[in-house]
Amino acid sequence: MPDDVRQLLIAVVKGHRRVEAVMEGFLELGLPGATVLDAKGMGQIVSTDLPIFSGFRSLFPGSGEESYMILSVLTPEQVTEAVAMLRDVCNDFQEKGTGVVFSLPVLDFHGPL
């Protein structure tokens, strides 16, 4: 694989403690950095912002916790390491409402890594 191949790692993680653990994991792995954004999932919007649907809260596990979206441009090898760490922190994403992680190819990138 060429040295310039990059992927965008996208993770949505529920809970402040989990996102702190993920950031510690990024530092321990020596990953170049990440952007962390506050995020709202459909369950959070439906169950809190639309009172008419508040009865559906039970359909959206984890809707009471804050959500964070983590974005990082990484090499494929770094993505593998980061996903393993995220799975460890988030208990393999087995519980509904814990979060998700995936990556997409980056076709063009400008800036330092």
Where on the chain are the PLM-derived regions?
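Positively charged, small/polar-rich N-terminal and surface patches that mediate targeting and assembly
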Residues: 1-113
